[in-house]
Design a protein with these regions (language model features):
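Short beta-strand-to-loop capping motifs
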Residues: 158-159, 194, 324-328, 371-376
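Phosphate-binding core of ATP-grasp and ATP-grasp-like enzymes
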Residues: 170-178, 183-226, 234-267, 271-279, ...
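Glycine-rich active-site loop/lid that clamps phosphate-bearing ligands
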Residues: 324-354
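Short, well-ordered beta-strand elements within core beta-sheets of diverse protein domains
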Residues: 155, 183, 228, 284, ...
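ATP-binding N-terminal substructure of ATP-dependent carboxylate-amine bond-forming enzymes
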Residues: 1-95, 301-304, 309-317, 326, ...
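Short, conserved charged micro-motifs
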Residues: 55, 129-130, 163-164, 329-335, ...
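Active-site nucleotide/adenylate-binding loops and adjacent lid/helix of ATP-dependent enzymes
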Residues: 99-180, 186, 198, 226-242
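ATP-dependent carboxylate-activation loops
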Residues: 273-294
Length: 397
């Protein structure tokens, strides 16, 4: 029996755990202790921090695992790279993991290899002259933590008066002594899910994003297909391929963020794992195969024939998703789903139960559930999504 080590036991790792179990793989989960749903599903649990790569490597060696993987978070990616290198497992290398989890290293690689991206500067927090260093950047600019995932530690600044407060926000969301400031590219943001296997980019699936406007944009849902011209799609593929090579990503899922301006695609950043916020499900529904299964198969040493799985990229199944959120801190008093059974309502999930504490939505981890729908067309999927959301009632007091 094969063994797999899954890093994390939260909402985004649960589908990995369930899929590995379905495939008959002995499933080991490691995470810090907490109220995480993946613990009760695993064959074996280690209550260890997934960033402690020495302990995780010791576990992987002791258990003689055939693969190591995570989903929906960058936190454990460095550890995966370390373990894959040390044990010769199939997955991204430590070098690639370092680049994928440090926005400065990523931007430097893009610049070195000619990947189209925003102009940037590296800034040390203790540099009193930092405003002069970024004076040649065109406003507005983005202040970014180099080591936080999602939207945390990212602030858009429209005038020099906002520099100091933005720097404080970044400082509160980083373990590093430096950050980056980059020019804000005005355009249409979109994302893509992709997979690279043995040096080959197996697919790229562009998707649109629903964004919550807080201190910065926070993705709260996605949809596919995303309307790109043939020329723009070819350009996005070219830039993504260049970014993958620049970062030396291999044998891993890819979560990509882009922005398109004047028909040209700019790479914002890439992650060496599948996306959060129902993005793995988006891939599964669109192409008609279980994406979590393919991620696990590759991680445990198999070669997946994506060409046989993806018959026709142009005829994918339209789908859309949205997080469930609270507009205030409090305790869930009640929650109900009044939707009638419908094969096109793929999933309604509540992350918590009545009596649990939740937060007003500001960042991705504040989610309290999600809804996923599909349809004959994107309009049908989106229309059904909003109708389904209207029939879900959650009371927080």
């Amino acid at each position: 029996m094969k063994k797999i080590l899954i890093l994390g036991a939260g909402i985004y790792q649960v589908p990995l755990i369930k899929t590995a179990k379905r495939l008959g793989i002995y499933t080991i989960v490691s995470s810090i202790y907490g109220n995480y749903p993946g613990f009760e599903l695993a064959d074996k649990v280690y209550y260890e921090n997934t960033v402690d790569y020495r302990k995780i490597l010791s576990i992987a060696r002791h258990e003689q695992v055939d693969g190591i993987v995570t989903a929906g978070t960058d936190v454990a990616v460095i550890t995966i790279g370390k373990v894959c290198d040390a044990l010769g497992l199939k997955g991204l290398s430590f070098e690639a993991a370092e680049i994928a989890t440090d926005k400065l290293l990523m931007k430097m690689q893009y610049e070195k290899h000619g990947v189209r991206s925003a102009k940037f500067r590296k800034i040390f927090f203790d540099d009193p002259d930092y405003k002069n260093i970024i004076s040649d950047l065109t406003l507005p600019v983005m202040f970014k933590s180099v080591d936080s995932s999602g939207s945390r530690g990212i602030v858009k600044v429209t005038s020099p008066e906002g520099f100091d407060s933005a720097r404080r926000v970044v400082l509160e969301n980083t373990r590093s002594d430096y950050f980056i400031v980059e020019e804000f590219i005005e355009g249409e943001e979109f994302g893509a899910q992709a997979f690279v296997q043995e040096g080959k980019l197996e697919f790229i699936l562009p998707h649109g994003d629903y964004v919550f406007k807080g201190d910065t944009g926070v993705p709260v849902g996605h949809f596919a297909p995303f309307d790109l011209s043939a020329e723009s799609l070819a350009d996005a593929r070219e830039q993504l391929t260049g970014a993958v090579r620049a970062m030396n990503l291999n044998n891993c899922a890819i979560n990509a963020d882009f922005i398109i301006r004047d028909g040209k695609t700019y790479v914002l950043e890439l992650g060496g794992r599948s996306g959060a916020t129902c993005l793995a499900e988006l891939v599964s529904i669109f192409y008609g195969f279980d994406y979590y299964e393919q991620i696990i198969r590759v991680a445990t040493g198999e070669h997946v024939d994506f060409d046989s799985l993806i018959k026709d990229e142009a005829s994918g199944v339209a789908n859309a998703s949205m997080l469930l959120m609270s507009d205030k801190d409090g305790v869930i008093v009640s929650q109900e789903d009044l939707n009638e059974p419908d094969p096109d309502i793929v999933e309604v999930q509540f992350d918590y139960k009545p009596g649990d504490k939740v937060h007003a939505f500001r960042v991705g981890p504040h989610r309290i559930g999600h809804v996923i729908t599909k349809g004959e067309s994107l309009d049908e999927a989106v229309d059904l999504l909003h109708k389904a959301l209207d029939k879900i009632h959650i009371t927080v007091e």
